[in-house]
């Protein structure tokens, strides 16, 4: 009791350091750590930067990660906390081993043609194709008569975060899927022959597979959409809790607004939209625009945390 007769307040539990077992009787007990409701929820993580990545210059060959791991504070390559985007550029007539430590990786062929070979399946690919590869250690890419440029997004950071490994082929939740440019154009023609409602966010082609059709995803956690914008239009501002990685496929005088910042498109640029950021896409040009978007949306749909909302009418 103080001189004035009042009782001293106990220290705030938020100021307690991390606690250990007082007298552990085993190695398992010694590994226990304890926090409290005053200090357990004040972990400060770096924000996900909104950033644009350019494709590799002509004549530069190899795998080019769109890596923000330093800004994100993680010790593995990552574009967003759970996704990694990359470019792969190959010289004509060369081959590249491509191990994939992911549940699945989405690919888009920007230029050139070649052959993809896995352990049990393979196919020829050409510019404009989309394909999905389940995680595996033994893929090989072969470029044919011209240089090849590909864009890919997978969930490698998600597996690295939990030190996980791709499932064995018989247990994998996804299969190899190949969507040719011709089939994609057929699907676009069908979409543009139909009407839309006020609640539809533009005209976009959503990719899925036989195994993931019920969820409308391409992998359990990744969604892929091929969005379009007519000339002199914009996609209404909106937000969602998934992060988004966008490839600018087609369009002149196009830009995105992300958290109030104008992000001009350049050919084949990769744009990062942070989770929760208000954003919109704009086409001020005279021709239609197209852009591919990969999100970790499957994860949020499953967790009921997508939080999608339009921010304008």
Regions found by a protein language model. Name each.
Residues 91, 95-129, 243-267, 305:
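A short beta-strand-loop-beta hairpin characteristic of the jelly-roll/cupin
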Residues 52-86, 95-119, 127:
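Extended, compositionally biased flexible segments
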Residues 2-46, 236, 243-313:
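C-terminal functional regions that serve as terminal interaction/effector modules
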Residues 142, 158-163, 299-304:
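A short beta-to-alpha transition loop/helix N-cap that caps and shapes the active-site region
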Residues 91, 124-146, 151-156, 264-285, ...:
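Conserved metal-binding segment of the jelly-roll/cupin
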Residues 2-80, 160-225, 307-309, 313:
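A short, N-terminal "cap"/entry segment at the start of jelly-roll beta-barrel domains
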Residues 76-78, 94-106, 138-145, 215, ...:
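Short, low-complexity cationic-aromatic patches
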Residues 64-74, 84-101, 208-213, 223-240:
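Conserved short histidine dyad/triad with adjacent acidic residue
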């Amino acid at each position: 009791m103080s001189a004035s007769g009042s009782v001293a307040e106990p220290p705030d539990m938020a100021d307690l350091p991390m606690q250990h077992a007082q007298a552990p009787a085993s190695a398992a007990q010694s590994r226990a750590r304890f926090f409290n409701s005053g200090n357990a929820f004040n972990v400060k993580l770096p924000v996900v930067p909104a950033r644009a990545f350019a494709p590799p210059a002509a004549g530069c060959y190899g795998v080019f990660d769109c890596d923000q791991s330093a800004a994100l504070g993680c010790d593995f390559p990552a574009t967003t906390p759970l996704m990694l985007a990359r470019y792969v550029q190959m010289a004509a007539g060369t081959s590249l081993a491509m191990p994939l430590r992911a549940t699945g990786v989405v690919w888009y062929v920007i230029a050139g043609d070649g052959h993809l070979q896995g352990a049990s399946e393979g196919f020829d690919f050409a510019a404009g194709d989309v394909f999905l590869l389940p995680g595996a250690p033994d893929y090989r890419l072969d470029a044919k008569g011209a240089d090849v440029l590909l864009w890919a997004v997978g969930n490698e950071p998600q597996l690295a975060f939990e030190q996980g490994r791709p499932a064995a082929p018989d247990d994998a939740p996804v299969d190899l899927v190949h969507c040719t440019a011709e089939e994609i154009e057929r699907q676009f023609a069908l979409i543009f022959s139909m009407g839309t409602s006020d609640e539809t966010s533009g005209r976009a082609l959503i990719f899925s597979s036989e195994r993931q059709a019920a969820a409308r995803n391409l992998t359990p956690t990744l969604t892929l959409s091929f969005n379009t914008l007519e000339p002199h239009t914009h996609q209404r501002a909106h937000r969602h809790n998934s992060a988004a990685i966008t490839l600018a496929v087609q369009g002149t005088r196009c830009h995105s607004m992300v958290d109030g910042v104008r992000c001009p498109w350049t050919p084949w640029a990769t744009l990062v939209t942070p989770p929760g950021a208000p954003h919109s896409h704009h086409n001020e040009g005279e021709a239609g625009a197209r852009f591919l978007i990969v999100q970790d949306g499957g994860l949020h749909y499953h967790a009921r945390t997508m939080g999608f909302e339009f921010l304008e009418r």
